[in-house]
């Protein structure tokens, strides 16, 4: 039990640091190990979601003035609808094939954006927002990792890193809240999840403080390439695990 507490604490520090520094990645980081220490995959995604939600809440309180709702609401509403549907079919999914496809997709996307990001101009049109929200909803509902599609949209559509961080964290805060309610309805919010949250919250706060310092020293262009690299590494991890 003591070992699990230490592992959860350290995982929460790392995941919160990544989220605060890059604007996403809490679920990607923590879900590489969390399923192995939780009773079920559904409980792991639930714990990941509420810890990530806490991280996002802290950031939203700090960056609320940078939110532009007209660029946020369409992608957010699409995400909510799709992710709820994905959660309801979670128990019937075969993860082996999905992990392979997810890993390949993340690697291709990260390479494409890293080399062609200067040529890519993401317009804040409704079709683009719906597409990003749909992909994000599927990844969030199935894997608890809704970040990459939304982040690629926001990092291209927002004019500076403060607005990028405000938009992504408001998106993740609202999305994780809805997904937590859906997971609770499906029986994934258990006593074990509640206890895990108590152990992980201190790590979330520590990781957030460290990440906040690092974020202040990052330029906008460097932040983009860190995001692309992290998405690619995440894809490689999925392939190796599959």
What are these regions (language model features)?
Residues 4-73, 133, 137, 147-201:
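Small-residue-rich hydrophobic segments that form or flank transmembrane alpha-helices
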Residues 43-115:
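Membrane helix-loop-helix hairpins that form the core translocation module of multi-pass transporters
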